[in-house]
């Protein structure tokens, strides 16, 4: 009795010294022997390694060049803003040589549009990253043609009425939106990220 109490006292005070549980075997007549083993739970540290593949420089350059198409075509909407704030034109002086070269080519806008759509968007040899950026730029360029069509249809006139002021506000808003999309697309492409322009990205994604 004393030895039993001593063994129980050692087990309670030092659990590590307690004997390990042995598997319990149950044998039934005419059947196999079942062995029940105690489950041991061990805390395992899960290490998640995030694989990151940087975007190649060529894909970034093509994406940046794609967003230049709608931006160049949207400069015509900024004429009222530049006339009211001439100093804003100084910010765009570095791109004037490229813009003059772009406008010196006959039908440069149509050539760039179809070249970008057929040569990049529909070219499966390019990655989805490049094709999506190109399609988003093409979609934005198509949307930029809508204000011109509305202006020709409505014909606000040359006076200082409400129609003319509405056209000026609309053109200025279109230019600001296009400029923000251009900056957003260029910065995202430089960082190797995918820019998602509201409404435009959904329409571009459905075309791929």
Swiss-Prot record:
Pfam families: TIC20
Reported consequences of knocking out the gene: No visible phenotype.
Residue range covered by the transit peptide: 1-49
Transmembrane segments: 61-83, 101-121, 134-154, 172-192
Membrane topology: Multi-pass membrane protein
Places the protein is found: Plastid, Chloroplast inner membrane
GO process terms (BP): protein transport
Functional summary from the UniProt entry: May be involved in protein precursor import into chloroplasts. Not redundant with TIC20-I, TIC20-IV or TIC20-V.
Entry protein name: Protein TIC 20-II, chloroplastic
Organism: Arabidopsis thaliana (Mouse-ear cress)
